[in-house]
């Protein structure tokens, strides 16, 4: 299998892009092989006309088919919470198909759930090297640097890289908006939340984020309006994955309502 990647999309590390004025092509090839570790023995890397070509040595069709069956089983094991079994299966898949981005990203997710942040980051870094347009890898990297490593500048770097390829992805925009709010860049956070809601009008996380932003910046009435709009759009029975954010939205509404009524009664 051959993979072609523009040099401009090569990331040399957290917050570091390929720079032709600083990095030679030989350095990039060495970096890529080092990033892939033991996998580099199964691949050839070359650069021509500003494009990296990675050629993976294909396994036999029988081995590939067996690996794909293991991938399906690994996903099932992970969904059922059998993380150690899923870990072994994903690794087994990647021994045969090292360029399988979905398997590698899922492996990173398992590492995250097991608390192995460094391994999760390593696998996601390879995902991005294989496919610089893999949206979920940028989201996960941004989340790692936001929640675990607490480096907001690097988190911003990954969200922005993701948005270069997927400017209208709702989850990327929402996570970036939350990061901007945490950094105190309220105007940009507001723009991002609103853009997300224009793209995904029934996305509870962005309603909650925007409402929280208005509360933090001293606009409780605007916050209440946003939450009321969410409640109108909210399905009668919230999906399980959205139930928590809906509950938080109701609690936030009650808190703001109580605060505004208290101020009104005082005056």
Regions found by a protein language model. Give the residues of each.
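Long, contiguous interaction/recruitment modules in multidomain scaffold/adaptor proteins
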Residues: 1-69, 79-80, 85-88
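Alpha-helical segment of the N-proximal tetratricopeptide repeat
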Residues: 63-102, 106-113
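Helix-start (N-cap) detector for alpha-helical repeat units in TPR-like alpha-solenoids
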Residues: 67, 101-102, 135-136, 170-171, ...
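Structural signature of tandem alpha-helical TPR/SEL1-like repeats
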Residues: 79-88, 113-126, 147-161, 183-195, ...
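TPR/TPR-like (Sel1-like) alpha-helical repeat modules
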Residues: 204, 208, 212-238
């Amino acid at each position: 299998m051959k993979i072609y990647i523009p040099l401009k999309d090569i990331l040399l590390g957290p917050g570091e892009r390929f720079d032709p004025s600083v990095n030679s092509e030989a350095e990039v090839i060495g970096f890529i092989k080092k990033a892939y570790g033991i996998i580099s023995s199964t691949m050839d890397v070359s650069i021509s006309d500003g494009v990296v070509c990675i050629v993976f040595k294909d396994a036999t069709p029988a081995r590939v088919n067996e690996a794909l069956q293991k991938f399906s089983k690994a996903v099932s094991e992970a969904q059922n919470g059998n993380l150690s079994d899923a870990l072994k299966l994903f690794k087994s898949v990647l021994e045969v198909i090292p360029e399988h981005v979905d398997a590698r990203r899922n492996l990173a997710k398992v590492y995250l759930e097991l608390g192995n942040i460094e391994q999760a980051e390593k696998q996601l870094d390879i995902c991005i090297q294989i496919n610089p347009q893999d949206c979920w890898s940028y989201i996960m990297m941004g989340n790692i640097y936001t929640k675990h490593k607490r480096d907001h500048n690097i988190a911003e770097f990954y969200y922005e890289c993701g948005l270069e390829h997927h400017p209208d992805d709702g989850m990327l925009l929402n996570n970036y908006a939350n990061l901007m709010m945490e950094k105190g860049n309220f105007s940009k956070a507001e723009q991002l939340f609103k853009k997300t809601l224009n793209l995904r009008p029934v996305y509870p996380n962005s309603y909650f984020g925007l409402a929280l932003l208005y509360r933090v910046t001293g606009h409780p009435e605007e916050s209440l309006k946003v939450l009321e709009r969410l409640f109108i759009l909210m399905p009668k029975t919230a999906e399980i994955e959205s139930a928590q954010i809906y509950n938080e939205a109701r609690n936030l509404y009650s808190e703001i309502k109580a605060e505004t009524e208290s101020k009104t009664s005082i005056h």
